[in-house]
């Protein structure tokens, strides 16, 4: 018979009591009432907060957006096909955040910062909230450094500064993405980190942009965030905020960043879809009442930081698509009122062969002129004035049969100036090359040439100046001014190249 010793039993009980861990865990849970169309309605989750992440039984993550008296409306970050009615959901106590690091450069990722380029995982030790508050007034300083796009029409007449928000607006197929990608290509060697956010685009279009950037060596300083047209609305809505969080990471590390949102119309449509499915009351054009806040809180994150914070910057180029040139629609007017100016691309100009199809008359930059270098200011003022007068005269000349000599000369000059603004895609020009081009046009050196010869002459002039007068570039880049010496060099180069060009043309004719 086994004898039970009381002291042994009490010893075992004492050991067990010592090992007992009195950890009490409270989990905020709920039950799925209904699921479908990327939306789930949850009963319970009493303590959940707006914007909090919730986790479903089978692993899908969602964001609690509607906090109602009887249920919680959750948008799903995924298709949610495996979620079943009656399954449990738990609140995570976290809001959406993504990992951030230098390793993201040259990669293509989705809205959750997961790589989608098949080049393996991205290592990151830090993370950042997708929705961070924008810098306050004291944290900023006014824009004063230029961000060159490499496009003559923009850098001369609608200049952009580091930390500015400049809207690119126009109909479909007018070259909006081309303007944005050319700007990325022009940042090579400028120590600017670029983030390109593609929202609701065709996968083939995004692949084309990535290929262009890779071929030109621009991917090494670029991050592409892509959520294509077949992605869930929630991820299309989040993608711009993910891009902004990545750009902010570099901005707060005293770096300069450029972010392109292509395009915010698609993000607004994704948000409208989510809101209508959540049964939020629709407003103008069926968009929810807070669609302005959707874009303002995103674009306010672009800033030029104060010297105390290291003078980093984040320049935003949001793109908005219009329907047959209607700038007074809801989303275009909202974004125009948030940004510091807009570049308007016209379908008529595009079809007339003027590319980039920038309508200089209604495009503005509200703060960029403070960032323009002096040399560009010296030549660009005259260009804008002459083009404005030309546009007025051209409209008038359609009705007048006989025009006096002065008017004919002005029309001829205007046509040549319009010609010098044309540029091929993926061929950005340096500031020095732009100054040469504008100076040649506004000072009448192109008036003697046929319109068809203008671009050929300018290409040859830029090459001639680069080879034979390298000191011109040195003067401009060191002083940022078109000095008397630089102007003399330029005049000599134009004269020499013009003689050579006319001689070559004569030889070709014969």
From Swiss-Prot:
It is a peripheral membrane protein. ATP binds at residues 170-177. The record marks 363 as: Required for activity. One of its GO terms (cellular component) is proton-transporting ATP synthase complex. It is found in: Plastid, Chloroplast thylakoid membrane. SUPFAM superfamilies: C-terminal domain of alpha and beta subunits of F1 ATP synthase, N-terminal domain of alpha and beta subunits of F1 ATP synthase, P-loop containing nucleoside triphosphate hydrolases. It holds the Pfam family ATP-synt_ab_C. GO terms for molecular function: ADP binding; ATP binding; proton-transporting ATP synthase activity, rotational mechanism. CDD domains: ATP-synt_F1_alpha_C, ATP-synt_F1_alpha_N, F1-ATPase_alpha_CD. Coiled coil: none annotated. Its main location: plastid. Its EC number is 7.1.2.2. It is an enzyme of class 7 (translocase). It catalyses: ATP + H2O + 4 H(+)(in) = ADP + phosphate + 5 H(+)(out). Keywords: ATP synthesis, ATP-binding, CF(1), Chloroplast, Hydrogen ion transport, Ion transport, Membrane, Nucleotide-binding, Plastid, Thylakoid, Translocase, Transport. Produces ATP from ADP in the presence of a proton gradient across the membrane. The alpha chain is a regulatory subunit. F-type ATPases have 2 components, CF(1) - the catalytic core - and CF(0) - the membrane proton channel. CF(1) has five subunits: alpha(3), beta(3), gamma(1), delta(1), epsilon(1). CF(0) has four main subunits: a, b, b' and c. PANTHER family: ATP SYNTHASE SUBUNIT ALPHA, MITOCHONDRIAL. Belongs to the ATPase alpha/beta chains family. This is ATP synthase subunit alpha, chloroplastic. It comes from Phaseolus vulgaris. The lineage of its organism: Eukaryota, Viridiplantae, Streptophyta, Embryophyta, Tracheophyta.
């Amino acid at each position: 018979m086994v004898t039970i010793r009381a002291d042994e039993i009490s010893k075992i009980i004492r050991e067990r009591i010592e090992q007992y861990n009195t950890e009490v865990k409270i989990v905020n849970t709920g039950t799925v009432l209904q699921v479908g169309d990327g939306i789930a309605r949850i009963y319970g989750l009493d303590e959940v907060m707006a914007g909090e992440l919730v986790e479903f039984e089978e692993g899908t993550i969602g964001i609690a957006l509607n906090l109602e008296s009887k249920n919680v409306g959750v948008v799903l970050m995924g298709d949610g096909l495996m979620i079943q009615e009656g399954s449990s959901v738990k609140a995570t106590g976290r809001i959406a955040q993504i990992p951030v690091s230098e390793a993201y450069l040259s990669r293509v990722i989705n809205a959750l910062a997961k790589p989608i380029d098949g080049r393996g995982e991205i290592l990151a030790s830090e993370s950042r909230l997708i929705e961070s508050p924008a810098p306050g007034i004291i944290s900023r300083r006014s824009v004063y450094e230029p961000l060159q796009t490499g496009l003559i029409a923009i850098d001369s007449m609608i200049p952009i500064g580091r930390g500015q928000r400049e809207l690119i607006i126009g109909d479909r197929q007018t070259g909006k993405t081309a303007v944005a990608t050319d700007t990325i290509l022009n940042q090579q060697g400028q120590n600017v980190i670029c983030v390109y956010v593609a929202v609701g685009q065709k996968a083939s279009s995004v692949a084309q942009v990535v290929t262009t950037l890779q071929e030109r060596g621009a991917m090494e300083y670029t991050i592409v965030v892509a959520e294509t047209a077949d992605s869930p609305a929630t991820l299309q809505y989040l993608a711009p905020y993910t891009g902004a969080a990545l750009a902010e990471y570099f901005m707060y590390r005293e770096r300069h960043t450029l972010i392109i949102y292509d395009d915010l119309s698609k993000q607004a449509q994704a948000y409208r879809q989510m809101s209508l499915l959540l049964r939020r009351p629709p407003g103008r054009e069926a968009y929810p009442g807070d669609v302005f806040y959707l874009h303002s809180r995103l674009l306010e994150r672009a800033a030029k930081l104060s010297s105390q914070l290291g003078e980093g910057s984040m320049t935003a180029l949001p793109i908005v698509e219009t329907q047959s040139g209607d700038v007074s629609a809801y989303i275009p007017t909202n974004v125009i009122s948030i940004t510091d100016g807009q570049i308007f691309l016209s379908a008529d100009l595009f079809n007339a062969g003027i590319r980039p199809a920038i309508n200089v008359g209604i495009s503005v930059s509200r703060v960029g002129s403070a960032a323009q270098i002096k040399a560009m200011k010296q030549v660009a003022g005259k260009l804008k004035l002459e083009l404005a007068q030309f546009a007025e005269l051209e409209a008038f000349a359609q009705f007048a049969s006989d025009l006096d000599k002065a008017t004919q000369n002005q029309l001829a000059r205007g046509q040549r100036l319009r010609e010098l603004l044309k540029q091929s895609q993926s061929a950005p020009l340096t500031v020095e090359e732009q100054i040469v081009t504008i100076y040649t046009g506004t000072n009448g050196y192109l008036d003697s040439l046929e319109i068809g010869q203008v671009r050929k002459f300018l290409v040859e002039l830029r090459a001639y100046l680069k080879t034979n007068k390298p000191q011109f570039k040195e003067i401009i880049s060191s002083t940022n001014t078109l000095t008397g010496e630089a102007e003399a060099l330029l005049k000599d180069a134009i004269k020499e190249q013009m003689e050579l060009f006319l001689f070559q043309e004569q030889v070709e004719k014969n």
